[in-house]
């Protein structure tokens, strides 16, 4: 107390130094300044685990992401992750739809967007093989003739447009949402294309009828289709058929023909020079809605008209249907109802455009060499009966947020973790440790935790959700209990069981017993079969053969390895397997008793016991009684934890002992009269596995309730006056009318932490608000009840396991009703050993209760007096009644 007062005064002097003119103002100083200094002690939250989550966007796949957490070597690290937020990226395609009379169907150039490379790519496009000096893949070497080269590539061109090469088809799944938009030609010929394929128009100043082209010479009048007779075209560009005007028109009426000027470019879908086509497009208008071919006067089709789009054979856009126009955008929005390939086609035919065959597929069959092909092109008249040309540039986007990603794609996504000694961002080339969806292991070293997603798929998007937690509490208790005590015992009994088993099967007497039992079994079986007393079925024969094989294998040298691998390990490892999987929160995966560490972290928390000690000092309002109940309940609960540990050890020892005796019981399964002993042996092994598992399940359920109740029993405490000091003088009993009391401003009482509990009043005595006396009292009783439940779990679980496995515990000698409880017997022995220490620790408590609380003193008997006890300050205890009467 002197030290406490000195400390308080020292703090006051430091906070408020005295000055000469202060006089006695220090007497008016209170302890309110200390309140802000010491503050309040809050009820702690049980945070043995550091938990958090992170969302890793697939756009950052391959890069390490910081969690901001540090982990400790040998302590639990849990990582759970989900790909529920991952969806397929919208599949993007650039499509160039072009009319070319050399192909029976429209040309369709397709470029696919590769998300991993962030580029478009024209897969399977029949490009030229270039020399090593060319900087542009697919470029034509300057010393080669375009037409001669392309003649040998005609078959590749046909295969490309028939999807028989490696070019990608646009696949659509049922439920996919398809969006097709018209775009400018620059969008298709984007420079962001792999290997620079189709980044520019396919064109040449030299006419090559066997080469591929992309232009239609529409210039600024792109995304349009022309289908008109030669007469309608010529009536616009040269109605008079002026021979001095080189228009390419000849003939009149139905005999009108049109031929490209200075070349035969109409063969490749370029019927006019750029200037001429611009002039022609300026003279015609857009065709009316739902107009067919050969509309008079000539007109052009736009907004996708003239093109049919199908998915799996189902038409999603009719030929005469226009794209929806919104501002500058023209698009079609469609949700697929079936699986299939998207196809761009038209029912307008190109056949009969010329009098001679212009199909590239016919040229391949007819001409075996280039000179004969050139002669055919140069010697024929390529005047067109009608003109059908033009193109559309489109971007196709296909997505489906409702459909989940495929199983193959899911398997390709992986998560890795990495632990580094410092917080420096690791290099992406550093490999991490892969984890499954529910990963739990001990951290291999101390350091900072990093996570990353490895995603080899280029067509998915979204966020991978990762929840991670690591244990941050102490592990001293489980290290002592498991590594220091239990593991040596279990390892020793494992070795004992193995050695005893091996010695047993090598014993000549045991081997003779096995051989005799097998011989007797076969003889009895044969006699019963001969006598007709045995009705054999296929199952009966297989069962008897298996029994003979198992017992015969028992006396072989590899008997232990066989039975331990395929049978005994089910029980020896099964008990650890069940306990490990039942436990949720644990400090270490390698320590099966790691679940005790979080429990001890909760119930040995220094703040909890500090607040309980503060409540112990509240004798005047009954909080001390609540604290005593809580402390006693915790001690009872700790004893229950000890029972769980002892129950596990006894169960494991029982399993190893039963396994060591396995040869005797396995022999007994041969005969029906002894088979019940074998069955009981199996039931006993099973009961030893089930008992600690069920016990732990009940124990953990009670622990969850206890954690909540404990936080309600312990209350917040703030720095305040613990014991008020009041000086008073009352002389009224002497006839002097003086009666006053006062407190010292500088020392109103003994300061300390005081529980933040409202005083009892009529308004709150029966309320159930938090921290009222009624709530604290009822909660402490509930806490005590739950602790008593945990204390009686062993007996209850023994009864439950006995009902399940039909294995009844032995009875106590002389008491048929009482069952033997090995755990209870061990606890009773521990109690006997600790009784002297318990009694010694209770002596100060009894003295405190007797002398201070009850104020009950016993004095030595005076000479001639009688020893008696009475209340302190009420009567003297060291004199007799006779002496007291004499004084009066």
UniProtKB/Swiss-Prot annotation:
Pfam families: TrbL. GO terms for cellular component: plasma membrane. It is a multi-pass membrane protein. It comes from the Bacteria. It is found in: Cell membrane. Keywords: Cell membrane, Membrane, Signal, Transmembrane, Transmembrane helix. InterPro entries: Conjugal_tfr_TrbL/VirB6 (IPR007688). GO terms for biological process: protein secretion by the type IV secretion system. Its main location: membrane. Residues 1-20 form the signal peptide. The chain crosses the membrane at residues 513-533, 565-585, 611-631, 649-669, 682-702, 781-801. Belongs to the TrbL/VirB6 family. This is Uncharacterized protein RP107. It comes from Rickettsia prowazekii (strain Madrid E). The lineage of its organism: Bacteria, Pseudomonadati, Pseudomonadota, Alphaproteobacteria, Rickettsiales.
């Amino acid at each position: 107390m002197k030290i406490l007062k000195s400390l308080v005064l020292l703090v006051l002097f430091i906070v408020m130094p005295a000055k000469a003119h202060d006089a006695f103002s220090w007497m008016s100083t209170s302890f309110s300044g200390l309140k802000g200094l010491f503050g309040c002690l809050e009820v702690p939250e049980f945070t043995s685990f550091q938990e958090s989550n992170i969302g890793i966007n697939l756009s950052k796949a391959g890069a390490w992401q910081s969690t901001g957490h540090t982990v400790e070597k040998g302590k639990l690290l849990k990582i759970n992750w989900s790909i529920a937020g991952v969806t397929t990226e919208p599949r993007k395609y650039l499509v160039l739809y072009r009319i070319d009379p050399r192909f029976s169907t429209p040309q369709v150039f397709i470029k696919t967007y590769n998300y991993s490379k962030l580029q478009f790519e024209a897969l399977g496009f029949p490009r030229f093989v270039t020399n090593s000096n060319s900087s542009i893949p697919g470029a034509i070497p300057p010393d080669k003739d375009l037409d001669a080269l392309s003649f040998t590539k005609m078959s590749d061109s046909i295969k490309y447009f028939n999807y028989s090469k490696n070019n990608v088809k646009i696949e659509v799944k049922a439920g996919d949402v398809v969006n097709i938009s018209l775009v400018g030609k620059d969008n298709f010929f984007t420079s962001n294309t792999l290997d620079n394929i189709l980044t520019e128009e396919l064109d040449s100043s030299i006419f090559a009828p066997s080469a591929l082209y992309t232009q239609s010479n529409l210039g600024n009048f792109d995304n349009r289709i022309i289908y008109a007779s030669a007469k309608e075209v010529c009536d616009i560009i040269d109605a008079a058929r002026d021979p001095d005007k080189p228009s390419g028109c000849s003939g009149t009426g139905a005999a009108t023909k049109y031929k490209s000027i200075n070349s035969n470019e109409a063969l490749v879908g370029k019927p006019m020079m750029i200037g001429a086509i611009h002039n022609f497009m300026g003279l015609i208008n857009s065709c009316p809605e739902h107009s067919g071919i050969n509309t008079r006067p000539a007109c052009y089709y736009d907004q996708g008209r003239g093109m049919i789009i199908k998915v799996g054979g189902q038409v999603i856009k009719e030929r005469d249907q226009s794209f929806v126009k919104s501002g500058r955008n023209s698009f079609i929005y469609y949700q697929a109802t079936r699986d299939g390939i998207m196809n761009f086609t038209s029912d307008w035919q190109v056949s009969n455009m010329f009098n001679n065959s212009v199909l590239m597929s016919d040229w391949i069959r007819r001409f075996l060499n280039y000179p004969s092909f050139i002669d055919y092109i140069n010697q024929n008249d390529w005047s067109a009966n009608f003109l059908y040309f033009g193109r559309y540039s489109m971007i196709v986007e296909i997505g489906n947020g409702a459909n989940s990603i495929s199983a193959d794609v899911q398997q390709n996504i992986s998560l890795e973790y990495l632990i580094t000694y410092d917080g420096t961002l690791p290099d992406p080339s550093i490999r991490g440790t892969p984890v499954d969806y529910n990963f739990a292991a001990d951290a291999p070293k101390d350091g900072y935790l990093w996570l990353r997603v490895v995603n080899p798929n280029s067509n998915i998007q979204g966020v991978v959700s990762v929840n991670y937690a690591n244990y941050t509490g102490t592990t001293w208790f489980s290290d002592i209990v498991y590594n220091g005590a239990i593991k040596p015992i279990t390892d020793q009994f494992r070795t004992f069981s193995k050695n005893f088993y091996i010695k047993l099967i090598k014993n000549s007497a045991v081997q003779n017993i096995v051989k005799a039992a097998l011989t007797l079994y076969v003889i009895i079986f044969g006699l019963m079969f001969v006598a007709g007393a045995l009705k054999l079925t296929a199952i009966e024969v297989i069962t008897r053969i298996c029994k003979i094989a198992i017992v015969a294998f028992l006396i072989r040298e590899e008997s232990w390895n066989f039975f331990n691998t395929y049978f005994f390990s089910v029980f020896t490892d099964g008990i650890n397997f069940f306990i490990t999987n039942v436990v949720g929160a644990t400090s270490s995966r390698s320590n099966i008793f790691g679940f005790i560490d979080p429990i001890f972290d909760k119930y040995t928390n220094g703040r909890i016991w500090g607040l309980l000690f503060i409540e112990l000092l509240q004798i005047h309002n009954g909080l001390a009684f609540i604290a005593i109940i809580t402390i006693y309940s915790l001690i009872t609960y700790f004893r229950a934890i000890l029972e769980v540990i002892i129950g596990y050890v006894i169960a494991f020892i029982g399993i190893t002992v039963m396994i060591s005796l396995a040869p005797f019981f396995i022999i007994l399964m041969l005969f029906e009269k002894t088979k019940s002993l074998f069955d009981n042996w199996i039931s006993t092994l099973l009961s030893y596995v089930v008992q600690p598992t069920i016990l732990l399940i009940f124990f953990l359920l009670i622990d969850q309730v206890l954690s909540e109740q404990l936080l309600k029993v312990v209350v917040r405490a703030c720095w305040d006056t613990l014991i008020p000091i009041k000086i008073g003088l009352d002389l009224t009993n002497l006839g002097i009318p003086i009666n006053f009391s006062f407190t010292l401003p500088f020392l109103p009482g003994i300061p300390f932490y005081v529980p933040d509990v409202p005083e009892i009043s009529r308004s709150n005595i029966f309320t159930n608000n938090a921290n009222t006396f009624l709530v604290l009292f009822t909660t402490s009783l509930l806490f005590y009840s739950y602790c008593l439940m945990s204390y009686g779990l062993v007996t209850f679980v023994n009864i439950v396991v006995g009902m399940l496995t039909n294995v009844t515990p032995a009875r106590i000698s002389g008491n048929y009703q009482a069952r033997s409880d090995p755990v209870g017997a061990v606890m009773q022995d521990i109690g006997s050993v600790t009784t002297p220490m318990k009694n010694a620790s209770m002596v100060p408590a009894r003295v405190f209760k007797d002398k201070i609380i009850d104020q009950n003193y016993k004095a030595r008997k005076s000479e001639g007096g009688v020893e008696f006890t009475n209340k302190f300050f009420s009567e003297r205890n060291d004199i007799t009644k006779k002496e007291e009467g004499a004084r009066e």
